[in-house]
Amino acid sequence: MRANDALQVLGLLFSLARGSEVGNSQAVCPGTLNGLSVTGDAENQYQTLYKLYERCEVVMGNLEIVLTGHNADLSFLQWIREVTGYVLVAMNEFSTLPLPNLRVVRGTQVYDGKFAIFVMLNYNTNSSHALRQLRLTQLTEILSGGVYIEKNDKLCHMDTIDWRDIVRDRDAEIVVKDNGRSCPPCHEVCKGRCWGPGSEDCQTLTKTICAPQCNGHCFGPNPNQCCHDECAGGCSGPQDTDCFACRHFNDSGACVPRCPQPLVYNKLTFQLEPNPHTKYQYGGVCVASCPHNFVVDQTSCVRACPPDKMEVDKNGLKMCEPCGGLCPKACEGTGSGSRFQTVDSSNIDGFVNCTKILGNLDFLITGLNGDPWHKIPALDPEKLNVFRTVREITGYLNIQSWPPHMHNFSVFSNLTTIGGRSLYNRGFSLLIMKNLNVTSLGFRSLKEISAGRIYISANRQLCYHHSLNWTKVLRGPTEERLDIKHNRPRRDCVAEGKVCDPLCSSGGCWGPGPGQCLSCRNYSRGGVCVTHCNFLNGEPREFAHEAECFSCHPECQPMEGTATCNGSGSDTCAQCAHFRDGPHCVSSCPHGVLGAKGPIYKYPDVQNECRPCHENCTQGCKGPELQDCLGQTLVLIGKTHLTMALTVIAGLVVIFMMLGGTFLYWRGRRIQNKRAMRRYLERGESIEPLDPSEKANKVLARIFKETELRKLKVLGSGVFGTVHKGVWIPEGESIKIPVCIKVIEDKSGRQSFQAVTDHMLAIGSLDHAHIVRLLGLCPGSSLQLVTQYLPLGSLLDHVRQHRGALGPQLLLNWGVQIAKGMYYLEEHGMVHRNLAARNVLLKSPSQVQVADFGVADLLPPDDKQLLYSEAKTPIKWMALESIHFGKYTHQSDVWSYGVTVWELMTFGAEPYAGLRLAEVPDLLEKGERLAQPQICTIDVYMVMVKCWMIDENIRPTFKELANEFTRMARDPPRYLVIKRESGPGIAPGPEPHGLTNKKLEEVELEPELDLDLDLEAEEDNLATTTLGSALSLPVGTLNRPRGSQSLLSPSSGYMPMNQGNLGESCQESAVSGSSERCPRPVSLHPMPRGCLASESSEGHVTGSEAELQEKVSMCRSRSRSRSPRPRGDSAYHSQRHSLLTPVTPLSPPGLEEEDVNGYVMPDTHLKGTPSSREGTLSSVGLSSVLGTEEEDEDEEYEYMNRRRRHSPPHPPRPSSLEELGYEYMDVGSDLSASLGSTQSCPLHPVPIMPTAGTTPDEDYEYMNRQRDGGGPGGDYAAMGACPASEQGYEEMRAFQGPGHQAPHVHYARLKTLRSLEATDSAFDNPDYWHSRLFPKANAQRT
């Protein structure tokens, strides 16, 4: 069985190595190491040989042919030219061994300890079948080992071979006996040396026929026909490239004694530096890189690192490096989740040489004293020393029992970190209790306890712990993390002298002596505190770095009275002990050290400085002149000045011709690559339909092969898979197209992506300027979706990094483009499910594209359900119906669109920052929403609020959103106000550039892949504009006044949807001309503003949110079954009619002034036509936000920017604020809420109260106010406010700092109708729904 397993492993290695090219395109295959052991019958053995050696040229190992039948066809062995190990032929019945091309047997492994060729017992005693010929006609070299050919009854001509001409080692044993006797003679042309009777079977002699001048092989008898010294097996000429085989290594066809070394000597820096042309030894071949299943050990390719080295990855190269002690070894711990509950005699040996414990370590009394119930004997205390190698414990350390004769825990003297990833009992990461004989802790190397509490109790003899400063060990806050009690009192310890060593600092110590200090008062050497380092005396001399003593380099000469060195390098010595080569002290001058152009030789002068030898010295020297060279004297060939001049001129001409040719070739390849890249990016494929009755669909995506895609690095990971940066290498092409590869896997394992589905074809057929087009897909066990690589990254990262360079025009244009992309997806029936700023990518600084759509529908239904335990579910971007019922529609995407726009307007703030995800659904049910961003007017904010309506049918469509943002993008400063901060006396600097030139070059050129991505801009007909104009702010943005801000920043908070006095406050401040804007709504709790870097951290469910799943399941169980109102019902149409009925007709589509990218430019509407604000989706009125009903049944949305309408006159303006019944923001008061009925209320104007000290120039209006003619000075139509008796929503007063309230205004107070109950936020409460939707006036309750 063991031999069979070995064959299977070698077969696997063969399949990996087969077909690889090394050296001169040699087909390399692995050998075997089974000896005379065989598995199965002769037929099975033959099949194994065939799989291993078909078309093989170089056998990396041993060629073993054992127990093969007489009718076996071994002609597949004829290609073998070299065997690195031995050749074993035994117990076979075939007549001829066809190895006519075998030239060299290296003998790196020998059979029976001494034979490179072993042939024995190749006959059948019951038949005439036997081995008769060894056709090794080309075998001319056995580098190591002897020959054994015995007991082959029918094998002939073996005694005619001159084995000394083949075997290099003269002392090698050669045994040839007891073989065939009745053999025909050799052919006369062979002169008695042959492998068979024919004239073609003569032995080729390459040594014994050579002239005496030849040291090895030759290709003729003349003295000038000697082979190169590096040849093996003969040659066809005198050069190292004429060898039949190489004695040592084959470097690109030339035989060399060693492969190019990884380090070469630099004459300028006097250092060994990495050789850019290094190669590694792979068998007898020099290769530029080892096969993927090998690692580099110094200069060789090996299958595994030796025991004292570990495998590391350096710049993508797997290498073996010394461990510097014990090599890292991770071991399983004890406790919860482990097979063992405690360390005991049954598992203690499993911790030998462990450096890292994955889990916990528990020391209980049942482990040390034994467990009779489980028949586990007592633990030998001496075996606890295996833990001296442990440096890290990822979980906790629990010591509740310890051997009586051990008075500390010094077996953990090398422990540096306790991770606390899993905690014991009440959250302890270090627990030491009831160890009656322990006097000190002894954790001398412990530097960090990452998490958890410390419990040290009931250790009657324990001292020294009183002195420890635990804040230096604990990470994070230390309050309430220490529970140390009932140990030996401090006064008793002091009385017995059990105090810290005087060399310890005030940080305390773990035990007695200078080696147990937490930190040192002066210096430390090897973890032991000392008074001073050996600066001026003592051995070895030292220098100090961060109060740590380090030894000087061994080549530094110890100095008296002054410092010997100032660092650890050989170039930091004050004086060298032996020689100095440049700035470095060395033990000897370089002698034959490999340099960039050959070996380097130097000699020491009288000052022991290393000086270079003459350039013609090839074996060293003793001086600078040519006559000082060691060895043979070289004859110099004089050259005239004319010859030198002609040589230089000819060289320059050749160089210029090569440069010109290279440039032309490079340009031609560049043009070809551009054309090929354009062809592949633009061209789609027609894929046959899955149903024969369907028509073939034009699918823009391709079906890739796995060999065409190459992943370079991981860009990120999300809910459905991992995104890689990679390249697409079309089959048969040499171009590399940069792409993004998203690997989608079904975690349940129930779905395979082997077949191409209709949904995959649907995704592949999508093509729009504002969605990331799918270039293709690669089916398989995991589905790979391939899109074009956009180096500018996500829109979320962009707005965070360049918030100081983003203007309102660009922000609104991005909103238009995202809406257009989502509208295109809606037209094609594609629900996104995960729209967020992180899933919007920048194709250019002015064009964005929606990405990551349609991925969820590729997985089975169970995997698309909302799982609160999933670590990356975007709860904060999801609509309520998606959170509670797993319902995803285009209108749930509208909700996510509103959150995405909010992210843009807050420059990448995290939604609901500071809130646990379990609180978000309840918060949304109560009617609270994200707060109004600081740069947004009420118009823009109301568009967001409409996207967050409870009833999905009331939310706008993406077409309406695109039209609305297009309208706003024509006058950006009117809707977005961005104020730049500048201090007094500081002139505002130039507007910062959004991107550096380097990043812009990355958009056009990917240097790593040698591609010009400027082609993408040409394909899309993008205008070549500078980045400064793309990111510039409109004129006047910097000087627009800003209102006062709330003390609690709303940019990262949320807003209750039922703030009754918000509109009134805003109206009053806007109408009165005050420079102070109305305070923004704030959250119930202060929330810190924050933003995280990855998709998995931005508002996604974490492991600590397990309670949310329970809440949702309870909410679902209580919810009533309701049929959602279809989009086509009367209420929906009436609302859409009110939103889309234009007052002034819009310009036809052909005249719409925007570019192909949806980038709308300001001030482009017709001069003679006033811009209409009612023809597109407008901002919702406060009464709509608050859940009240309008008087007019046909109009359920109130426009914030009203025109003069022919309507019945308003009621007379009240004479006082008390008559209005309004409730204003209570500055400085506590937050309160009220909830009333859902009766409709009429609109009343707001009285204008002038504020002292304000001027008309300070006034800034968000809305387009037109004269209404209603009352004195009233040129503004107030938004609807209800008296207290008619309000059907909550009112909230926001905190505001002192000084923001006009002193002369008196505010009326409203009494709340009833307090908010818990059932008001439940889905099964009809009052909740009717209080937050916008039904018609005659809507019936259900």
UniProtKB/Swiss-Prot annotation:
Tissues and organs where the protein is expressed, per its UniProt entry: Epithelial tissues and brain.
Residues binding ATP, per UniProt: 715-723, 742, 788-790, 834-839
GO BP of this protein: cell surface receptor protein tyrosine kinase signaling pathway; cranial nerve development; endocardial cushion development; epidermal growth factor receptor signaling pathway; ERBB2-ERBB3 signaling pathway; extrinsic apoptotic signaling pathway in absence of ligand; heart development; motor neuron apoptotic process
Transmembrane feature ranges: 644-664
MF term (GO), any: neuregulin binding
Catalytic activity of the protein: L-tyrosyl-[protein] + ATP = O-phospho-L-tyrosyl-[protein] + ADP + H(+)
Pfam family, one: GF_recep_IV
Superkingdom assignment: Eukaryota
Active site per the UniProt annotation: N834
Protein kinase domain residues: 709-966
Signal peptide: 1-19
Region listing for Disordered, in residue ranges: 980-999, 1033-1152
EC number: 2.7.10.1
Residues bearing carbohydrate: N126, N250, N353, N408, N414, N437, N469, N522, N566, N616
Impact upon substituting A1337T: In FERLK; risk factor for erythroleukemia; results in increased ERBB-mediated signaling; results in a block of erythroid differentiation and increased cell proliferation
Bridged cysteine pairs (disulfide): C29-C56, C156-C183, C186-C194, C190-C202, C210-C218, C214-C226, C227-C235, C231-C243, C246-C255, C259-C286, C290-C301, C305-C320, C323-C327, C500-C509, C504-C517, C520-C529, C533-C549, C552-C565, C556-C573, C576-C585, C589-C610, C613-C621, C617-C629
Sites of Phosphoserine modification: S686, S982
UniProt keywords, alphabetically: ATP-binding, Cell membrane, Disease variant, Disulfide bond, Glycoprotein, Kinase, Membrane, Nucleotide-binding, Phosphoprotein, Receptor, Secreted, Signal, Transferase, Transmembrane, Transmembrane helix, Tyrosine-protein kinase
An example Gene Ontology CC term for this record: basolateral plasma membrane
Extracellular-facing ranges: 20-643
Role noted for this protein: Tyrosine-protein kinase that plays an essential role as cell surface receptor for neuregulins. Binds to neuregulin-1 (NRG1) and is activated by it; ligand-binding increases phosphorylation on tyrosine residues and promotes its association with the p85 subunit of phosphatidylinositol 3-kinase. May also be activated by CSPG5. Involved in the regulation of myeloid cell differentiation.
Disease: Lethal congenital contracture syndrome 2: A form of lethal congenital contracture syndrome, an autosomal recessive disorder characterized by degeneration of anterior horn neurons, extreme skeletal muscle atrophy, and congenital non-progressive joint contractures (arthrogryposis). The contractures can involve the upper or lower limbs and/or the vertebral column, leading to various degrees of flexion or extension limitations evident at birth. Erythroleukemia, familial: An autosomal dominant myeloproliferative disorder characterized by neoplastic proliferation of erythroblastic and myeloblastic elements with atypical erythroblasts and myeloblasts in the peripheral blood. Disease penetrance is incomplete.
Subunit structure: Monomer and homodimer. Heterodimer with each of the other ERBB receptors (Potential). Interacts with CSPG5. Interacts with GRB7. Interacts with MUC1. Interacts with MYOC. Interacts with isoform 2 of PA2G4. Found in a ternary complex with NRG1 and ITGAV:ITGB3 or ITGA6:ITGB4.
Record family assignment: Belongs to the protein kinase superfamily. Tyr protein kinase family. EGF receptor subfamily.
Name the record gives this protein: Receptor tyrosine-protein kinase erbB-3
Gene behind this protein: ERBB3
